[in-house]
Amino acid sequence: MAVEKELGARVTLTHPALRPGSPPSRTPGEGAERSEAGEGLAVPAAFSDPSDIHHGDWVERHLPTWSQPYARLARLDRPIGTWLLLFPGWWGIALAASGWPDPALLLLFALGAVTMRGAGCTLNDIADRHYDAQVARTRLRPLPSGAVTLWQAALFLLFQLAIGAAVLFSLNWASVLLGVAVLGLIGTYPFMKRVTYWPQVFLGLNFNWGALIGWTAVTGELALPPLLLYLGGIFWTIGYDTIYAHQDKGDDLRIGVKSSALALGSHTRPWLFVFYAAALTAWAMAGLAAGLGFLFWLGLAGSAVQLAWQPACVAIDDPADCLRKFRSNRAVGWLMLAAIVAGHFA
């Protein structure tokens, strides 16, 4: 869009770190900028270490040098994404159980979440390697930094997919069919930010598919409760990933990448309340459909408090705070899991 190009040029020319020949960096807060994609869009303030690769972390301290780029491709250094992928699967298992969920299934889904989240991130890095080189947060990732080649990343992707397939084919056939059905969504998600301002919707469709597979892994068939659980998870993901996307909105606007953060701009906060309210409503309907008891509603209330706190307190122009609020969704995952399990007993 013409307005976006103009804004991108203004940001580039007014920040020496973004002039030609300089590495990309975050832009200073120079007041609210405007674009067709988001009224009153503020360019985020700079902060000391925008890169999501942190030298001296446990990967560098404890892993062999040759393995470190692969650990980072799989995001083993940043497990929050694995948790957010894993929880819907655990919820589905717990919702289908008549009491305590099967620990063997929980462990199997944990292995699947680690490998498939790693595979998804590797695929995303392959697709976005040229964009990532221009974004302050991602420019030091293994592909744009040259730590691995494209072929090495592709082979690592196949290795992870093989492990994921082994996990999937250890389940019943209903779960296998669902796992195969989601492959199209997994393959198309990395390209959605090029064509729509709502890639977060596609991420939600992907990340919460485990709710369906978790249920069928126990029961062998789909039903209304996991569908409602899945719907709630989609809205939850749209909310937390919109917060996450606000970290990169300055760079995204400059290089032409789309996100819900750009679409909503200064209207993000009220929309986060809407997304999270929709998630809680769908989860409540799932609990009703599954016949869960009082303790489920107590846990759901705790999740509601946490989800209300995020949009009420998030500083959407502070990338560090956006990351903190995004990571806080692990608490929602645990609260919902505890609520579903406890709801079978009281």
List each model region and its residues:
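Cytosolic, membrane-interface loops and tails of multi-pass inner-membrane proteins
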Residues: 44-68, 121, 125-148, 242-265, ...
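Extended hydrophobic alpha-helices typical of membrane-associated regions
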Residues: 63-68, 281, 285-346
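Intramembrane alpha-helical segments
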Residues: 67, 71-72, 111, 141-228, ...
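Multi-pass membrane catalytic core of lipid/isoprenoid biosynthesis enzymes
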Residues: 86, 106-113, 129-179, 254-294, ...
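Helix-loop junctions at the membrane-solvent interface of multi-pass transporters
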Residues: 94-95, 169-171, 192, 216-217, ...
